[in-house]
Amino acid sequence: MSNPSNRTSMRGQLTLRGVVIGILGCVIITASSAYTALKMGALPWPIIFAAVISLFFLKLMGNASLNEANVTHTIMSAGAMVAGGLAFTSPGAWMLGYADQISWLDMFIVALAGTILGLLATALIHRHFIVDAALEFPTGNAAAQTLRATEAGGKTGKQLFGSMAIAGIYSVLRDALGVVPSMLCTLNIPGVTFAIYNSPMLLSIGFLVGFAPVAFWFAGALLGNFGIIVGGTAAGLFDIVTAQGIVKSLGMGLMMGFGVAVVLKDILPQVAGIVRGLAADSSTDTDEQSLISGSLKLDAGIIGLGTAAIAVIVAIALDLGPVPAVIVTLFTFVTTIMSAQSCGQTGIDPMEIFGLIVMLIVAAFAQLAQVKLFFIAGIVAVACGLAGDVMNDFKAGAVLGTNPRAQWIGQAIGGIVGALVAAAVMVALVTAYGPDAFGPDKSFVAAQASVVATMVSGIPSVPWFAGGFIAGIVMYWLGIPAMMIGLGVYLPFYMSLTAFLGSCVKLAYDKWAAHRDAEAGLSDEDKAAKDAAFQEQGLVVASGLLGGESVVGVILAFVSVGLSLLG
């Protein structure tokens, strides 16, 4: 781990070629992340994917260090969670009929405000979480280990881009040409969308997440669709429409309960320690620990001025008013701490839950139009998403000995580029497909945004939501993944089934690798090395399949917009 009081120079880490590669990758990953989040209701961390391709391209251009690759992938992945923050909140306004009240400029201001607040907050909390508390940040740690494993090069590039090409071509055949169907094995079950979604991306998500977590996801799907909708209607307890409302309410309650439980169990007990740690840091820091300017005093001024500027901008440009703007700005700093703690301990960043919490707090203090509440949730979700990404990158940098200031500057570059791209993609998608394409059982399920919309407009079944909320809290305390179960309850069954099939492929893949190693009679050291290479190959191919379909989906959306503009 790097020592912040004796950090390495930025020379050779934040480079021109790295910035160019990072920005190009950021554009692609941000666009595909927005599409993935809307289409699938989930967004896997892109850090490992970005790390692999960053090192690959840098090596094509000559010698490259792991530190340069670390900074490059920091730039490259920055926009993904900005896109996630928008995709998990803003489409809720489209579902409620407010699409014509949200412009591209509004979307960009929301993304930019969240990005800047997230950057300022992480400059403050970096030392506490990475150095003093030294949290695990499993995704960031995995990215560092992946860079080390990939350094030797080899077949990585061919595997990655070959799988991307296959998924991209397949997506064109399915979505543009209609040669292959979107759904397979469809069954007519009242109230249940039973099918296998013909999607390399969703299969890859199941593969990347792994069998055990997706098994809980699928269990939730079975409970909601066959336990409540099929079983409940067969028993005459309620009709199909009522059952579907119950399922949505239960799923939302489970996810909300999980988010609140994370705050209650893991965040609040740490807040006092975090504040004490930050205060202690401020008395002992040197300018070497500055991440923004190289001077702690100048950093303090920049953070204060930047925070005030964002409060003024959102108050005027988004018409939130002074009191809501101040509340949003202050609570965003609190929620980024929550986000960092959650990512550091669990690898999960429930950004939309944090957005919901602040949105409800603001709604209690101010009378705002519903569409404005989505702006608030979006700002907070973007800030928390970016904070999670930044802290994971900082963890990878600590493992590899990268200069954290170089990383922070890279994150600022990628975050601002990501805000531009994410806003453009969101507007392009709603223009191409129309606001009616977003929501449960629609082309873009936008599960998290649907939760936000429901919290704004009302809950179908308050008792079931309350029951799910309580169950989510209890389950988290018992170590049961309520978020995954709630996601399965909430999402259409065809998505859960397809992801489960992908996780089954991962289970078979791991068992085959173990059987092969056992038959080979390898030593423990050779077995570990071979298994690491095998796992990396699976990661690269699955990431390529996911990225290929995502990128093509965005390209098709832009083509559709272009054709509509041409008449």
Placement of each model-derived feature along the sequence:
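Alpha-helical multipass membrane-protein architecture
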Residues: 1-567
